[in-house]
Amino acid sequence: MKIVSVILAVALGAGNPAWAQDTSELQLVKRVFEQLQPISISKNREYCGYIGRDAAGNVAFTKARRGRKGTCVPRDPDALAVVTASYHTHGAYSPNYVNELPSVEDMEGDEAEGIDGWVATPGGRLWYVDTQEMTIHLICDLGCLPADPAFVEGDTGEILPSYRYKALVQKIEAVGG
């Protein structure tokens, strides 16, 4: 999938990719999460929506919807001509959740909708969920986005830069998720 290659190239410092529309999605995602993360953390709720293209072909996003602890269902993406991905936050840090990784349910939900996903974590990580390959990719690490001051680094153990579906299931089960 082209967007994953572009995003990984940006994340790995490979310079400016040729597809500006894909880097514009990444830039938009970061701006959206920079605004949502502090609210999500302070209210300890997930916030979610969709990203895609409007009728003019511009990268756009739907208004974020407030969810609950551990879940969020976005509004219908009527304003988007094409939906490319979901986005959501994971709320405040909690030792009771494996919230530094996209969940298996996050990945399965995006796959069921036929789209990819973006996930922001309480530690300030940004993840990309590629449902065509059923992998998650760490786009930027701790503190890349606003982080919960109560976040405890390392409570989920070592976080790898990517996971395939089966490895994600195993990781979450191993840490008690």
Give residue ranges: language-model regions.
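Sec/Tat signal peptide C-region and signal peptidase I cleavage site
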Residues: N16-A20
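Small side chains
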Residues: G13-G15, G52, G117
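N-terminal secretory signal peptides
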Residues: Q21-R68, V73
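Bacterial N-terminal signal peptides
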Residues: K2-G15
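A generic structural signal for short, solvent-exposed coil/turn residues
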Residues: L12, S42, R53, D78, ...
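General alpha-helical segment detector with a strong preference for membrane-spanning helices
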Residues: V6, R53, A92-S94
